[in-house]
C-alpha cells in the first residue's frame, strides 16, 4: 500500500524530535506493508463514532498514535493525524 500524509499529519510530525520521527516513519512503513495482517489487532482498530467511515487508529508507540483512512480503490493509506495519545483523538 502507498502512504500519503495530510498537511495536518506533516505538521504533527514536525512537532516530534528526530528520533521519534524516525520511529514513526518506520512504523508507518511497516503498517503500509502489513495492513491486512494488522487489521483488527490491538495495534490497528477501526474508530467508531467518527464523521467519516473507514478511519482507523494505529499504535506507533506506547503514547503515540496515528489516525488514518483507507482508500480501498487505490490501495492507499491516508495518514490524517499523528500525535500523543491524549491529544490525537480531539
Language model feature labels by segment:
Residues 1-63, 70-77, 87-90:
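Basic, Lys/Arg-enriched alpha-helical interface segments
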Residues 80-84:
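Short, solvent-exposed aromatic-acidic interface loops
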Amino acid at each position: 500500500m502507498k502512504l500519503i500524509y495530510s498537511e495536518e499529519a506533516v505538521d504533527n510530525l514536525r512537532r516530534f524530535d528526530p528520533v521519534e520521527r524516525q520511529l514513526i516513519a518506520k512504523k508507518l512503513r511497516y503498517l503500509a506493508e502489513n495492513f491486512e495482517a494488522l487489521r483488527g489487532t490491538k495495534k490497528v482498530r477501526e474508530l467508531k463514532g467518527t464523521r467519516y467511515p473507514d478511519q482507523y487508529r494505529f499504535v506507533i508507540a506506547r503514547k503515540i498514535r496515528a489516525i488514518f483512512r483507507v482508500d480501498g480503490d487505490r490501495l492507499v493509506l491516508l495518514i490524517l493525524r499523528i500525535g500523543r495519545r491524549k491529544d490525537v483523538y480531539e
